């Protein structure tokens, strides 16, 4: 059976939804390029500013209503940040307001605790690598953490609304050169639980990140597998 590295596109329109519904059919490509370019520049600036002040971006939410764009930014403390100094976020808000027109509204939300996402796990892996831990130890730490989280509940965005899911499995892959005595790259994989990339009734979160070390570039890939547990807003499986 076919196996996809990023299985999210396999489920678009069935269980998972698009991050954006912006369409360019019949429209000028120049306008689309300008929008995407400005969005990426804005997100890159926010990520660098937030990281400089000891925090990490958790995720974004873009919404448009009555010719106004609302950007909600959810951030969490870095793993080595023991103090929560939020004074610089007022300066960031002023910078963004001056940079963008009055049609852009920014909201900042502090998540004092990280939620279980694939993005969180890749950032945590990067932190462990920066602490100069070996790849096998990193895999053990991540697996022990995720094993404690198996069957835990999480609310996710379903195509008909929100749904409560449970974590049923995960897969972690670490690829790169970690040993100075060996010139060849190595791959470390660990899988636990139910891992079906082709099951359309499941939810999959995928994330990857590149880590730059003195020995070269390392790649981290994380898959989290969820199954429906409880449908919200009066929806049930019989209606699907």
Curated annotation (Swiss-Prot):
Which Gene3D superfamilies does UniProt cross-reference here?
Ribosomal protein S3, C-terminal domain
Give the record's GO CC terms: mitochondrion; ribonucleoprotein complex; ribosome
Q: Which domain of life is it from?
A: Eukaryota
Query: Which cysteines bridge via disulfide bonds?
Result: none
Q: Which GO terms describe its molecular function?
A: RNA binding
Keyword annotations from UniProtKB, A to Z: Mitochondrion, Ribonucleoprotein, Ribosomal protein
The keyword Transmembrane helix appears for this protein = no
Q: Where found?
A: Mitochondrion
> Is Mitochondrion included in the keywords of this UniProt record?
yes
UniProt family annotation: Belongs to the universal ribosomal protein uS3 family.
| UniProt name for this protein | Small ribosomal subunit protein uS3m
